[in-house]
């Protein structure tokens, strides 16, 4: 059971988890863990499932998924009849009015839909992942000199579960460098899995780029792959002018994570998100929703 904080009703909700029985069995049973290490965490497994989700045969999954998780398709740019495979549905674009972007340059917005955790006063040797499990920021980005620039900074971890809108966006005007890709495995990023496998973010396939934002300093913008994520697709053009709310990229099928790192004294995260993070609870947000402000 995954409990998260709902900002709208100021109370806790229980997340509906896609494939919850499978996740619990895989990460809690000896047989499941053996299969995980031998096969499921490997690129080959995610590639096979990604291949299936790109084929017309997978289209039959769409209606059941929409009904089971109460997905509002009226927000989608595409009609259901336009979708030829499950990944068409999973990577669907939303209408602009579905995720309005506030122009106020002082407002920090969420880069995507999902559940967010926030950590201030970043300790590079011990970044909290979930349930008190820590990892090294140095290990995460594999660049010691760059990591040192973010000492005492702020970290945002946005978890996109399979039921979420799976495109991620820029949070400010600016310019973004080329993407750096780091090889890794494909463990799940669901809290069920994170509590069983230490330092998942450092072990999984991930990509990051430096985003030179106009109002929030130089931001490390990282995407972490997960089980059954066929691909991390970057759609932005490096080293060109970017506007707040522009799409950066998207994940193909699977739960995934976006992590942002800010330098010291650049942003202030909203108190409700910070307080819930300290209690160990994620907060539900949508792309474009204000989550903080410029210092």
UniProtKB/Swiss-Prot annotation:
Is synthesized initially as an inactive proenzyme. Formation of the active enzyme involves a self-maturation process in which the active site pyruvoyl group is generated from an internal serine residue via an autocatalytic post-translational modification. Two non-identical subunits are generated from the proenzyme in this reaction, and the pyruvate is formed at the N-terminus of the alpha chain, which is derived from the carboxyl end of the proenzyme. It is found in: Cell membrane. The record marks 255-256 as: Cleavage (non-hydrolytic). One of its GO terms (biological process) is phosphatidylethanolamine biosynthetic process. It holds the Pfam family PS_Dcarbxylase. The modification Pyruvic acid (Ser) is found at residue 256. It catalyses: a 1,2-diacyl-sn-glycero-3-phospho-L-serine + H(+) = a 1,2-diacyl-sn-glycero-3-phosphoethanolamine + CO2. Its cofactor is pyruvate. The active site is at residues 113, 169, 256. The keyword Transmembrane helix does not apply. Its EC number is 4.1.1.65. One of its GO terms (molecular function) is phosphatidylserine decarboxylase activity. The keyword Lipid biosynthesis applies. Keywords: Cell membrane, Decarboxylase, Lipid biosynthesis, Lipid metabolism, Lyase, Membrane, Phospholipid biosynthesis, Phospholipid metabolism, Pyruvate, Zymogen. It is a peripheral membrane protein. Binds 1 pyruvoyl group covalently per subunit. One of its GO terms (cellular component) is plasma membrane. Heterodimer of a large membrane-associated beta subunit and a small pyruvoyl-containing alpha subunit. Catalyzes the formation of phosphatidylethanolamine (PtdEtn) from phosphatidylserine (PtdSer). NCBIfam families: PRK00723.1, PS_decarb. Belongs to the phosphatidylserine decarboxylase family. PSD-B subfamily. Prokaryotic type II sub-subfamily. This is Phosphatidylserine decarboxylase proenzyme. It comes from Clostridium botulinum (strain Loch Maree / Type A3).
